[in-house]
Amino acid sequence: MVFTLGSFVLVTVAVAFVSWLKTKGTDETSKDGYFLGGRSLSGLVIFGSLMMTNLSAEQLVGRNGQGYAAGMTAMGWETMCPIALTLMALFFIQKYFKLGISTIPEFLESRFDRATRVIVSFIFLVAYIVTMLPLVLYAGSVAMERIFGITALMGGNCFMATTVMCVALGIIGGIYAIFGGLKAVAVSDSLNGIIFIIGAVILIPVLAFIALGDGSIAEGIRIFATSSPEHLNAIQPADAQPPYIPWPMIVLGCGINHISYWCTNQSIMQRVLGAKNLKEAQKGSLLTGLTCVFCPIFLVAPGVIQFIYYRTVPAVSAGRHQHLPQSDVGLLRRSGSGHCCYGYSGSAHAELCTEGCHHCPYRMLWPDDEPSAVPLPVL
């Protein structure tokens, strides 16, 4: 545990230091410098930032919980991502770049009027504070609390442990956003993405298969493929009930939802609009779409592996969010991989550090004041 915690802290400091080195020359006294990283982001940086924003803490914890309870049908939520990202690269980004906007509400002003921009800006801001951020903080705190055993350190008080982790994640995410702007957030997201790939995409599935096969990865894969075929069925009938996903919903429901999320969500588009040019923005979007094809492997499969390992399905509403951190805690502790645990906190930071939502209301209230790195991140 000491080595795990130590490596976690070391990686956290290293990522912060590298992010500072990469951003210290950026002019953050201008609107574009602070909110859009000086419009200097490359395609690879955008790709890493988009992936970490999408694979936020509530996705990591929630999708694996769904995989545990319902099987591979949970991958239906991710199926339409590549299509939505392709549409974003081919159509939406070109329109946004042509208009030269820095936030989505600015597009609404050009399409409708100033009042629409103000109303939508405040709706986005309130929705982000009330609905999105609490989920991100809670899911991230659950994962970190279970992996590091914070409850035991606080005398068994789970509420206090979760609260402390929520506050810690919020403070760290706020530091990145306030003092670094979007470029620092994007650079740290890219580094987090590398760490996440090492941990969530490679290490955790491999260790899980080894545990399932009692030391043999080949045996683990065989057991995974043969022990519970119904849990590997990703296509459900049209009248399937929750937590299962009816197949028509994947196209008619998830498809529309993904277009809305990827093409109009400020936390997504802020990264894309910070690109140095249209080509880099499209490159980052298409790379993200390609990677999303493989998301079910590390978002859903670990939950299915845990179901096969324990051979029991919990009540659908009874603590399903605990399954991912519980299954990972033993794997990560055995490997001493605190740097992989950092992937969970990094995914939460990526979602927390979206400053652009407050930019539009700020400009509406003080139209003559060019923002000079005003520290008002949505936290």
List each language-model region with its residue ranges.
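Membrane-embedded helix-loop-helix hairpins and adjacent transmembrane boundary segments
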Residues: 1-379
